[in-house]
Each structure stands twice: as structure tokens, then as C-alpha cells.
Amino acid sequence: MRRAPPTAAAFLPSTLTLPTLRNAAASCTGCDLYKNATQTVFGEEPARATLLLVGEQPGDQEDVAGHPFVGPAGRVLDKALKEAGIARNQVYVTNAVKHFKWEPQGKRRKHKKPSAAEVAACR
């Protein structure tokens, strides 16, 4: 028998606002990514942003800090936004999944690509 793909549907609040979705994501166990992550990394900045940027997943530094795009990818993003004349606080930044997927590599946590099912669970 085939196992149903993971889903976060059971964790969706009845009222879909950024604050209620943030709270729901913080307690989501809809897929296994939450098990090894330090915390949920939800999207940030203005609710009515003119630009939305979606990354693959939080990285090691984002997992520790609890904020998206604060590590190396965030520095590249900040530089690109500055060159384009776009203020970071005008951009809503988030990731396709809200937990850092990794595998140990010595003392480091090495990024591991989330599966299509994990991404689908986080939609």
C-alpha cells in the first residue's frame, strides 16, 4: 500500500493571515523536516510587499537565527537588491520549506535538498 505524501493541511488555521500562518508553521509537523531543525524559519518583511522572493530552504545560519536570508545567500541577495535599487524592507523573503534539511559532515551541518514531497507539504 502506498503511503500518502506528507501534508501540512491539518496545521492551517481557519483564518489565513501572516500572523496566524506564522504561528501554525511554528508547530507544524506535517513532514519530517521539523525533527532536525532548530526552529521554523518563516517569511519576513512587509505583508504588502511589491516583490516576493522564495528560496529553496533556510540554511544553517537561518536555522540558528530564525530569520530567512541572513547567511551567505542573504549577503548575495542584499548586494543584488542594492545594485537594483530595491530596499530589502520592501521585499517579502521566504523559502519553499520552513525548516533546514541537512546531513552531518564532520562538525558541520551540510545542506541537503528538500524532496518534492517536502516542498509540496509546505505549500
Where would I find each of the regions flagged by the language model?
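A polyanion-binding, active-site-adjacent surface
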Residues: 1-123
